[in-house]
A protein has these predicted regions:
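Conserved short submotifs of the Hanks-type protein kinase catalytic core
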Residues: 87-101, 105
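Activation-segment/catalytic-loop signature of the eukaryotic protein kinase fold
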Residues: 83
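Protein kinase glycine-rich loop
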Residues: 21-27, 32
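Protein kinase catalytic-loop region centered on the HRD/HxD motif
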Residues: 124-136
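AlphaC helix of the eukaryotic protein kinase fold
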Residues: 47-71
Length: 268
């Protein structure tokens, strides 16, 4: 994983009881810092930006996401250590996963193969089962949100996740990454949990071939292919291909659930 960016004069030296050592990234909700706790353990600290922190509705939705994410089995994602949601600004401290994203790993070393690909498939499907069991639809499952830690893959970034209570965590607008979005997600026909299964199929195709199955060029071209064209899955290993194809069915009712997907991967 690339090292953290240096801190600027506008960045805090500490947050709560944690020292801040660098920036790990910046997203729509805020900034993620690399920090250390009092025992010297590295952590990731997400600090909400003003737009989220000062908007009661967005803040409440973020709090709901955090509470739901805390229910997800810790071996599947970056475990949340502390959620200081009443501080100014609110921040969340999670486990720091020291490893590249799947996107970075494939770009550097090429497609996954053999036992490594099988482990990736099983572990990420297990993570989706745990995420859905916690009542969450991730909505942005993609190679950049799979970290390859020393002890296995972790699914991260629930920033646009939907808590399964009938309310989207941002709005009912289309959100996600087009190359890994399901047709019904693109068309705004609702966000069932099987959008994550479709995304899993896209991610496994990418992991095994180095290419997203609907391309990664212009957004209109990708969107058209997702909705209307068959996926490009040449190069997906024979043992994985039927499962990936089932996950990439345009009709969500014909896709397996995350649990059914996992059972198929395990040979049940």
């Amino acid at each position: 994983m690339p090292g953290p960016e240096s801190l600027s004069s506008n960045d805090p030296a500490s947050i709560g009881d944690y020292s801040v050592e660098g920036r790990l990234g910046k997203g729509g909700q805020g900034v993620v810092y690399l920090g250390r706790d009092r025992d010297g353990e590295e952590v990731a600290i997400k600090v909400l930006n003003d737009q989220w922190a000062e908007n009661d509705e967005l803040r409440a939705r973020f709090e709901k996401e955090v509470r739901a994410a805390q229910k997800v089995a810790s071996f599947c994602t970056a475990a949340i250590h502390e959620a200081s949601l009443d501080s100014d600004p609110p921040f969340v401290v999670s486990e720091f996963v020291d490893g590249p994203s799947l996107q970075e790993a494939v770009a550097k070393s090429g497609p996954r193969r053999g036992a490594g690909l099988q482990r990736l498939a099983v572990n990420t499907a297990t993570a989706l089962v745990a995420i859905h069991r916690a009542g969450i639809v991730h909505r942005d499952f993609k190679p950049g949100n799979v970290l390859l830690g020393p002890d296995g893959p972790r699914v991260i970034d629930f920033g646009i996740a939907r808590v399964d209570d009938g309310q989207a965590t941002l709005t009912n607008s289309i959100v996600g990454t087009p190359a890994y979005m399901a047709p019904e997600q693109i068309e705004g026909r609702g966000i069932p949990d099987k959008v994550d299964v479709f995304a899993w199929g896209c991610v496994m195709a990418f992991a095994s071939t180095g290419n997203a199955p609907f391309g990664a060029d212009s957004v209109p071209a990708v969107v058209h292919r997702v909705v209307s064209a068959p996926p490009a899955v040449d190069g997906v290993p024979e043992e994985l291909l039927p499962i990936v194809q089932a996950c990439l069915d345009k009709d969500p009712s014909r896709r397996p659930s995350a649990k059914e997907l996992l059972m198929r991967l395990l040979g049940h």
